[in-house]
């Protein structure tokens, strides 16, 4: 991948001179720890959990210092386990980022300057809104997660610079999502040890190791889009067409059995974007036709599975308007009213304390909790990322071999999802943003090594 600017290249084991980065790394770790402690409250977790967490943190720290990429791989392996906040993935990536700061691997210049500025401004507005918080402890905990996830996006932009790392991320993301989808779908119809944990909240809806099917379903979509593009045009995952097709089918079935209308919208928008973009390139009509045939086969397989398990009636019910939709829209109206009463916002994480149910919209939450200015900054960040994703496609840029077309499609799906579900604390949203930012740092007209070596023409 093309190097950034003319600055000296840091080797993976290079250590910075002096103490500033060490202090910054320690400060990050302490800030995240403080947010976790405040969020857990005065009682804290049981002693056994605390000891296990401490041992786990020390193990991850040792791993990150000795085998940095292996620690990152561990983070992606547990990306699909988010029952509480902070989640296991947060502990792993927080330690990885702290080590990256100390060892000079975390370079903010690897992300666009505008992204860093908008992230910093949004966090500052979150901090300002804390003055209005009715529960300062929850505000501190919620803000610490937002800050960590913002940094995760910026770190991702600098990490995925090589094809080896991009391939590792792609394999782990697709593999983790596919295994989660397979186990969660099977758990709906077959009892096995731990199966109840995979659909604990709703008997008829798969939720994986998330708290809500509306988070689990959308988690599978980017992986499905990435493997779909690899199936049509192999770049990082050579061979194994049948395995890719199986993974795609399992992921589509997983999205279906989440019975999340937002997840269905997410996948539908992403697929439509791919269908719109693929014909713009040479040979794109043929690939778009192959895409349609592949999707027909996958959805047909998912439909057969739904009918065979006797779930077709439930699928039809879920596709209709639900009785609780009125409550959700009422809560969103309440969010607008909160913004009118509190111009600076009511503070991070306060929406559920002031309204009967969650915001069910990233934008309504931002409006209520950070005010009009906070919403404007967040929208600017999301739309600028969308603009960069479109530009990456038109200029033929990819992120170390990761298709800019697939990244654009997945991002559009997430944006559509964000109107109906609060996505601010979704780990894969910020990772996806980081991957798009990384691609934008290529020079105009530049193409990744993977694209040029395989004869790929823009847009990618």
List each language-model region with its residue ranges:
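A membrane-periplasm/extracellular boundary helix in multi-pass inner-membrane enzymes
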Residues: 16-18, 182, 186-191, 257, ...
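Membrane-embedded alpha-helical segments of multi-pass membrane proteins
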Residues: 47-57, 85-105, 143-152, 216-224, ...
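Alpha-helical transmembrane segments of multi-pass inner-membrane proteins
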Residues: 29-33, 56-61, 97, 120-128, ...
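Transmembrane alpha-helices of multi-pass inner-membrane enzymes
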Residues: 31-33, 95-100, 268-272, 408-415, ...
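N-terminal hydrophobic segments of proteins, predominantly signal-anchor/transmembrane helices
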Residues: 62-150, 402, 414-415
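A juxtamembrane structural motif centered on a specific transmembrane helix
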Residues: 2-26, 30, 395-400, 433-460
């Amino acid at each position: 991948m093309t190097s950034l600017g003319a600055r000296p290249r840091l080797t993976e084991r290079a250590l910075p001179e002096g103490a500033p980065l060490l202090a910054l790394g320690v400060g990050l770790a302490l800030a995240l720890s403080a947010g976790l402690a405040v969020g857990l409250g005065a009682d804290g977790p049981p002693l056994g959990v605390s000891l296990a967490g401490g041992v786990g943190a020390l193990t991850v720290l040792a791993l990150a210092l000795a085998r940095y990429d292996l620690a990152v791989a561990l983070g992606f392996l547990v990306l699909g386990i988010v029952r509480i906040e902070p989640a296991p993935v947060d502990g792993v990536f927080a330690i990885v980022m702290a080590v990256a700061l100390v060892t000079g691997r975390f370079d903010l210049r690897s992300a666009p300057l505008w992204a860093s500025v908008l992230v910093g401004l949004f966090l500052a507005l979150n901090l300002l809104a804390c003055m209005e918080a009715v529960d300062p402890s929850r505000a501190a905990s919620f803000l610490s997660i937002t800050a960590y996830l913002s940094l995760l996006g910026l770190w991702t932009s600098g990490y995925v610079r090589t094809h080896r790392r991009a391939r590792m991320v792609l394999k782990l993301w697709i593999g983790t999502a596919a295994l989660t989808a397979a186990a969660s779908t099977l758990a709906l119809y077959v009892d096995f040890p731990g199966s109840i944990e995979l659909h604990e909240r709703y008997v008829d809806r798969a939720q994986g190791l998330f708290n809500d099917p509306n988070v689990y379903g959308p988690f599978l979509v980017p992986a499905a889009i990435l493997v779909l593009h690899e199936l049509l045009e192999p770049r990082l995952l050579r061979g194994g067409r049948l395995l890719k097709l199986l993974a795609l089918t399992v992921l589509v079935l997983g999205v279906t059995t989440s019975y999340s209308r937002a997840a269905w919208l997410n996948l539908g928008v992403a697929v439509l974007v791919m269908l719109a973009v693929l014909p713009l390139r040479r040979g794109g009509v043929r690939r778009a036709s192959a895409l349609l045939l592949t999707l027909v086969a996958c959805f047909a397989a998912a439909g057969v599975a739904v009918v065979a398990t006797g779930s077709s009636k439930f699928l039809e019910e879920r596709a209709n308007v639900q009785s609780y939709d009125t409550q959700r829209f009422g809560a969103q109206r309440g969010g607008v009213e909160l913004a009118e009463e509190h111009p600076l916002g009511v503070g991070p994480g306060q929406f559920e304390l002031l309204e009967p149910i969650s915001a069910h919209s990233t934008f309504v939450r931002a409006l209520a909790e950070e005010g009009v200015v906070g919403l404007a900054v967040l929208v600017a960040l999301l739309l600028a990322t969308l603009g960069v994703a479109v530009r990456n496609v038109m200029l033929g840029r990819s992120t170390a071999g990761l298709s800019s077309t697939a990244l654009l499609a997945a991002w559009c799906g997430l944006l559509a999802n964000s109107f109906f579900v609060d996505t601010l604390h979704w780990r894969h949203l910020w990772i996806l943003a980081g991957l798009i930012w990384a691609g934008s740092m290529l020079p105009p007209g530049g193409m990744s090594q993977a694209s040029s070596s395989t004869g790929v023409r823009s847009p990618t």
